[in-house]
């Protein structure tokens, strides 16, 4: 997989609409974080989960485990996962929760864009549960720079033939680079299958600039650098020498 980032040509109205969508995304993200934090607090007070976790950790600490202990470890892992799911702490649970919350923003964000944000929150939950994460944090509006996608058939859809991004009523024109070398590289990069399209924003002194981040299957093509030095050619009878 590789990405191609193209600047979007936006009008004042389109910039306003995109900003509304980032506001909606920020709201949904923090709603999901609040819900996940409540679920994690309930899990911390679950005595059954604490007992299972203690037994599981005791087995993990052993350098060598018997077949019975390995079987018990798998059984405990399933029971722990069931406890987390019961408290609403699973990827699918968060996706379902935010899907319901996201219905009020159905004209601003697609179902898969809402789902992608739930997945981001779940990544934070995983760090708290299984990694070195200490707490799930709320985010400020300025912290959001990407509205994610999952397929090119839902949400922000990139049209290669027209070089437009069609997104729930918005048709956003993509700028192509002017230099011949960069332009040929972009076209070469877009030859693979378009997986999905993200909407990104970057802050400049003049304000936000918006980009289409197109995710393409396959490896990125090799960029060929064109030199600027002077080269002399000395043609011979059967060979040509370059200096």
Language model segments and positions:
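Nucleic-acid substrate recognition interfaces
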Residues: 1-243
């Amino acid at each position: 997989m590789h990405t191609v980032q193209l600047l979007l040509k936006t009008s004042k109205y389109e910039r306003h609409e995109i900003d509304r969508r980032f506001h909606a995304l920020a709201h949904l993200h923090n709603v999901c974080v609040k819900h996940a934090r409540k679920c994690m607090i309930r899990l911390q007070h679950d005595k059954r989960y604490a007992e299972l976790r203690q037994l599981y950790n005791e087995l993990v600490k052993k350098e060598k485990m018997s077949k019975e202990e390995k079987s018990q470890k798998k059984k405990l892992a399933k029971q722990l996962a069931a406890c987390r799911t019961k408290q609403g702490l699973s990827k699918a649970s968060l996706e379902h929760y935010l899907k319901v919350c996201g219905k009020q923003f159905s004209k601003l964000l697609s179902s898969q864009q809402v789902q992608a944000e739930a997945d981001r929150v779940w990544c934070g939950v995983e760090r708290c549960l299984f990694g070195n994460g200490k707490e799930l944090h709320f985010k400020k509006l300025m912290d959001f720079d990407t509205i994610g996608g999952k397929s090119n058939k839902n949400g922000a859809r990139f049209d290669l033939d027209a070089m437009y991004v069609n997104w729930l009523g918005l048709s956003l024109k993509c700028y192509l680079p002017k230099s011949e070398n960069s332009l040929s590289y972009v076209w070469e990069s877009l030859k693979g299958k378009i997986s999905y399209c993200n909407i990104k924003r970057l802050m400049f002194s003049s304000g936000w600039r918006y980009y289409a981040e197109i995710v393409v299957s396959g490896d990125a093509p090799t960029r060929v650098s064109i030199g600027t030095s002077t080269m002399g050619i000395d043609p011979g009878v059967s060979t040509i020498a370059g200096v």
